[in-house]
Swiss-Prot record:
InterPro entries tied to this protein: Natr_peptide, Natr_peptide_CS, Natriuretic_peptide_brain
GO biological process, one term: regulation of blood pressure
Entry function: Scorpion venom natriuretic peptide that increases the perfusion pressure, glomerular filtration rate and urinary flow in the isolated perfused rat kidney assay. Induces a decrease of the percentages of renal transport for sodium, potassium and chloride and an increase of the urinary cGMP concentration. Also down-regulates the mRNA expression of natriuretic peptide receptor 1 (NPR1) in the kidneys whereas it up-regulates those of NPR2, NPR3 and guanylyl cyclase C (GUCY2C) mRNAs. May exhibit hypotensive and vasodepressor activities.
GO cellular component: extracellular region
Swiss-Prot/TrEMBL keywords: Disulfide bond, Hypotensive agent, Secreted, Toxin, Vasoactive, Vasodilator
Family: Belongs to the natriuretic peptide family.
Disulfide cysteine pairs (residue numbers): C5-C21
Origin superkingdom: Eukaryota
SMART domains in UniProt: NAT_PEP
GO molecular function: hormone activity; toxin activity
Name used for this protein in its record: Natriuretic peptide TsNP
Subcellular location per the Swiss-Prot or TrEMBL entry: Secreted
């Protein structure tokens, strides 16, 4: 999974999270 401020990521239940800073 991608992390930090690089973009979007899917959390463990598949919800799209925006810029995860």
């Amino acid at each position: 999974k991608l992390s930090g401020c690089f973009g979007f990521k899917l959390d463990r239940i598949g919800t799209m999270s925006g810029l995860g800073c």
